[in-house]
């Protein structure tokens, strides 16, 4: 249910906010065991929040912009007094003493927290199969993955277990699951949204963003959570426009660049390619000018990312030693031995794999060959985007090379898993905003996503184009039945 539908229910007195929130919890209780999108729910707090909104309505007071909207939070984003586990044994018992800036802004705007959603451990993955709390299923086909690492957030929105969810995107972790689950996923410009309270994976790449049913809902969430934050030095001190204002503006004459290298990649599924190209035709019919552009180093993004991201993860995760917090092994003959055993048992296989890759890439004698070289390629990728944006307003690619794959297909094949982020990681390396919207289905009935990429701080352009496409295409007429 999108925001406007919920508001109509409330305004027309068809239901109180408390009743609507209880309906969501009933659905979660009876249906989520099949999906496993939530790690925990926060019913008592949600009911209290709902009652406060109901009082405002009864007293005919001015309502905050997200009043009564039920929202789920990815479990790598800190929530005061509510466990934030990162789906890891290492943080299974960690309860933050503070609220993240992004979630705090949501609650100040009237949003209601339903709970914390499942993810790949420490947000390292593309399938939500590495969680301590079990695998999440795709609502369109429960034998398939929802994508990752924000798979729980995307699945909860697609199944109707919340009206919106917040995720994090380091290399595609909002957009890829949004594509797999047939919902909207927005990764903002790096620094547009504060990372204060987001458990760090790769600090130069991580960004918080919304997963929603509609583009307009994503625009509302982005407006609420954006803006300067004194607790995050990388957060941009730039004006935040109301993204709703230009959502319905005509895209006649909008220059959309089709990245040649993406559509020529041998790993791109033919059905995905055809569906996205049909989307290109729709944009053309809506008045956009279609221009083919080249980004010669676009396909180098995946190799570059898997040097930089693990390197930063290696440094960030060094803090988890079982001394001050986190899992502590009861074994160990001394401090070093205890720390080693705590990390070996506290982290899962994929997290350990990435720590090892990153440590190697940063090690003496190898950092020049790997990490520093990857940073140089990152600069070249950014320059390719800069050159493309001299010719066009927005760039367009498929979100993912394939539709949702079966559980177990890639979990023991890291290379294939990493390649599922082929079309999303260059955006993070360049710090650009991008949105995934549904554009069709394959012959198995699985959703296909189309990605629009904007220049720095030009979320308004991609939201406008995505909204016009969404209204015209009406791709998602019915959600999975849950």
UniProtKB/Swiss-Prot annotation:
<keyword id="KW-0547">Nucleotide-binding</keyword>
<comment type="subunit">
    <text>Heterotrimer of A, B and C subunits.</text>
</comment>
<dbReference type="InterPro" id="IPR036928">
    <property type="entry name" value="AS_sf"/>
</dbReference>
<dbReference type="GO" id="GO:0030956">
    <property type="term" value="C:glutamyl-tRNA(Gln) amidotransferase complex"/>
</dbReference>
<dbReference type="GO" id="GO:0050567">
    <property type="term" value="F:glutaminyl-tRNA synthase (glutamine-hydrolyzing) activity"/>
</dbReference>
<dbReference type="GO" id="GO:0006412">
    <property type="term" value="P:translation"/>
</dbReference>
<dbReference type="InterPro" id="IPR023631">
    <property type="entry name" value="Amidase_dom"/>
</dbReference>
<dbReference type="Pfam" id="PF01425">
    <property type="entry name" value="Amidase"/>
</dbReference>
<keyword id="KW-0067">ATP-binding</keyword>
<dbReference type="GO" id="GO:0005524">
    <property type="term" value="F:ATP binding"/>
</dbReference>
<protein>
    <recommendedName>
        <fullName>Glutamyl-tRNA(Gln) amidotransferase subunit A</fullName>
        <ecNumber>6.3.5.7</ecNumber>
    </recommendedName>
</protein>
<keyword id="KW-0436">Ligase</keyword>
<dbReference type="InterPro" id="IPR000120">
    <property type="entry name" value="Amidase"/>
</dbReference>
<comment type="function">
    <text>Allows the formation of correctly charged Gln-tRNA(Gln) through the transamidation of misacylated Glu-tRNA(Gln) in organisms which lack glutaminyl-tRNA synthetase. The reaction takes place in the presence of glutamine and ATP through an activated gamma-phospho-Glu-tRNA(Gln).</text>
</comment>
<dbReference type="InterPro" id="IPR020556">
    <property type="entry name" value="Amidase_CS"/>
</dbReference>
<feature type="active site" description="Acyl-ester intermediate">
    <location>
        <position position="173"/>
    </location>
</feature>
<comment type="similarity">
    <text>Belongs to the amidase family. GatA subfamily.</text>
</comment>
<dbReference type="InterPro" id="IPR004412">
    <property type="entry name" value="GatA"/>
</dbReference>
<feature type="active site" description="Charge relay system">
    <location>
        <position position="149"/>
    </location>
</feature>
<keyword id="KW-0648">Protein biosynthesis</keyword>
<feature type="active site" description="Charge relay system">
    <location>
        <position position="74"/>
    </location>
</feature>
């Amino acid at each position: 249910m999108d925001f406007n539908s919920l508001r109509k229910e409330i305004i027309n007195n068809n239901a109180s906010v408390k009743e609507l929130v209880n309906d969501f919890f009933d659905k979660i209780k009876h249906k989520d065991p099949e999906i496993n999108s939530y790690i925990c729910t926060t019913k008592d707090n949600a009911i209290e929040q709902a009652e406060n909104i109901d009082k405002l309505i009864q007293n005919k007071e001015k309502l905050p912009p997200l009043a009564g909207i039920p929202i789920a939070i990815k479990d790598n984003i800190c929530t005061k007094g509510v466990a934030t586990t990162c789906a890891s044994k290492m943080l299974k018992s960690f309860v933050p003493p503070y609220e993240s800036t992004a979630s705090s802004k949501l609650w100040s705007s009237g949003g209601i927290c339903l709970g914390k959603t499942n993810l790949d451990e420490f947000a390292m993955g593309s399938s939500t199969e590495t969680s301590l709390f079990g695998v999440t299923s795709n609502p369109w086909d429960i034998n398939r993955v929802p994508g990752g690492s924000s798979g729980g957030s995307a699945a909860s929105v697609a199944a109707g277990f919340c009206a919106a969810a917040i995720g994090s995107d380091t290399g595609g972790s909002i957009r890829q699951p949004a594509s797999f689950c047939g919902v909207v996923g927005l990764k903002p410009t790096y620094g547009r949204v504060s990372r204060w309270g987001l458990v760090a994976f790769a600090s130069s790449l991580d960004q918080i963003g919304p997963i929603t049913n509609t583009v307009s809902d994503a625009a509302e969430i982005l407006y609420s959570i954006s803006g300067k934050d004194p607790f995050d030095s990388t957060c941009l001190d730039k004006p935040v426009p109301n993204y709703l204002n230009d959502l319905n503006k005509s895209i006649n004459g909008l220059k959309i660049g089709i990245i040649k290298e993406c559509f020529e990649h041998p790993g791109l599924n033919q059905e995905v390619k055809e569906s996205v190209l049909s989307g290109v035709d729709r944009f053309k019919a809506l008045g956009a000018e279609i221009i083919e552009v080249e980004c010669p180093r676009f396909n180098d993004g995946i190799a570059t990312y898997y040097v930089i991201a693990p390197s930063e993860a290696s440094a960030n995760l060094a803090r988890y030693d079982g001394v001050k917090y986190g899992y502590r092994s009861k074994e160990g003959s001394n401090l070093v031995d205890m720390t080693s055993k705590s990390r070996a048992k506290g982290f899962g296989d994929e997290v350990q794999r990435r720590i090892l890759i990153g440590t190697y890439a940063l090690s003496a004698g190898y950092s020049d060959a790997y990490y520093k070289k990857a940073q140089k390629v990152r600069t070249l990728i950014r320059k390719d985007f800069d050159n493309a944006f001299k010719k066009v307003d927005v760039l367009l690619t498929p979100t993912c090379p394939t539709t949702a794959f079966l559980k177990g297909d890639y979990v023991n094949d890291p290379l294939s898993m990493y390649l599922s982020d082929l079309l999303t990681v260059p955006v993070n390396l360049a710090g650009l905003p991008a949105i995934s919207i549904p554009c069709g289905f394959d012959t198995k009935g699985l959703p296909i996503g189309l990605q629009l990429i904007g220049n720095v701080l030009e979320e308004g352009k991609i939201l406008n184009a995505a909204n016009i496409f969404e209204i015209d295409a009406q791709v998602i007429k019915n959600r999975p039945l849950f």
